[in-house]
């Protein structure tokens, strides 16, 4: 399905004057992943922002629920002149990026042959390539805003596929795989939970740096050619991972910026709405979203 065809589904968004049009983007291996596109108006050409959360799975059901329950961020982006889309992609494969290497596509018997299956960040690549063909989207101004694992996806995407986005925001990026983090038993409150990211105590940046493969992380970051804003959360147990991700970007001479706020909610830049589309948003959440939009405004300005 081409993005200028009729969408697969049209979702009403509580509290919004704009519907969400669900399209299916063909993945690199010939399957399909959904995204729910909203544009500020029916006419015009707009910069576009991918919205992503977590480590995948759930398909259309997850996507439809997310569109309805997390419309505050989309309304803010639409009001600022951005098209945007909640997206869903395949489930993360543990250490798939680290061990899988670059995706190589060959040919056998007149058909494609791959050295591995595409990964979740390559589903985002497929979505970006698909939406770039939409008549309402400015293909030269694509961006990413992702939280948690979807923050790490930005690093993976920008490292493996330079130039796909103009800019990106990684919020509380769970970059343990990208940084090749090797935690020790002492990094967990309960040593029996070793290996579970949710149980790691990685608030201190120097502690994280000592446990990362810094040379490999820098090598991966050397390919990143787009501005990235990293947003942390002051008291998060993984704040050291978030901060080190920024520091290594800056040390690699990348265009990197850092911000962090004190907030009790993981993923606080994506406030949840009730059934009427009303969100209980506090000043900290609005300040963080303001900073994201300001970053996008700066880096997605029309090309001269």
PLM region spans:
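Mobile cap/lid helix-loop segments that gate and shape the active-site cleft of serine hydrolases
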Residues: 166-220
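Alpha/beta-hydrolase active-site loop
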Residues: 102-135
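Conserved alpha/beta-hydrolase "acid-adjacent" motif
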Residues: 237-243
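Short beta-strand/loop motif that positions the catalytic acidic residue
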Residues: 224, 230-232
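Primarily recognizes the serine-hydrolase "nucleophile elbow" in alpha/beta-hydrolase
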Residues: 126-186
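N-terminal cap/lid segment of alpha/beta-hydrolase-fold proteins
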Residues: 2-43
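C-terminal catalytic histidine-bearing segment of alpha/beta-hydrolase fold enzymes
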Residues: 255-304
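Short substrate-entry loop that stabilizes the transition state in hydrolases
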Residues: 44-46, 54-94, 238
């Amino acid at each position: 399905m081409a993005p200028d065809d009729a969408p697969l589904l049209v979702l009403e968004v509580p509290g919004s004057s704009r519907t969400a049009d669900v399209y299916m983007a063909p993945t690199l291996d010939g399957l399909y992943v959904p995204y729910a596109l909203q544009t500020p108006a029916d006419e015009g050409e707009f910069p576009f922002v991918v919205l992503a959360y977590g480590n995948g799975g759930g398909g259309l059901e997850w996507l439809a629920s997310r569109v309805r329950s997390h419309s505050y961020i989309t309304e803010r982006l639409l009001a600022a002149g951005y098209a945007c889309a909640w997206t869903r992609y395949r489930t993360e494969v543990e250490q798939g990026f680290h061990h899988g290497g670059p995706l190589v596509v060959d040919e056998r018997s007149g058909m494609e042959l791959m050295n591995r299956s595409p990964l979740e960040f390559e589903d985002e690549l497929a979505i970006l390539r698909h939406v770039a063909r939409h008549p309402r989207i400015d293909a030269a101004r694509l961006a990413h805003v992702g939280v948690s694992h979807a923050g790490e996806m930005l690093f993976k995407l920008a490292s493996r596929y330079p130039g796909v986005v103009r800019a990106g925001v990684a919020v509380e990026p769970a970059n343990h795989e990208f940084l090749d983090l090797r935690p020790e038993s002492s990094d967990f409150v309960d040593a029996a939970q070793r290996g579970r990211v949710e149980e790691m105590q990685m608030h201190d940046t120097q502690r994280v740096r000592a446990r990362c493969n810094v040379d490999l992380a820098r090598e991966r970051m050397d390919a990143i050619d787009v501005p990235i804003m990293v947003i942390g959360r002051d008291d998060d147990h993984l704040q050291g991972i978030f901060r080190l991700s920024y520091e290594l970007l800056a040390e690699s001479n990348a265009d990197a910026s850092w911000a962090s706020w004190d907030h009790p909610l993981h993923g606080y830049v994506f406030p949840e709405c009730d059934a009427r589309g009303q969100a209980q948003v506090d000043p900290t959440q609005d300040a963080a979203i303001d900073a994201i939009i300001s970053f996008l405004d700066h880096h997605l300005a029309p090309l001269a």
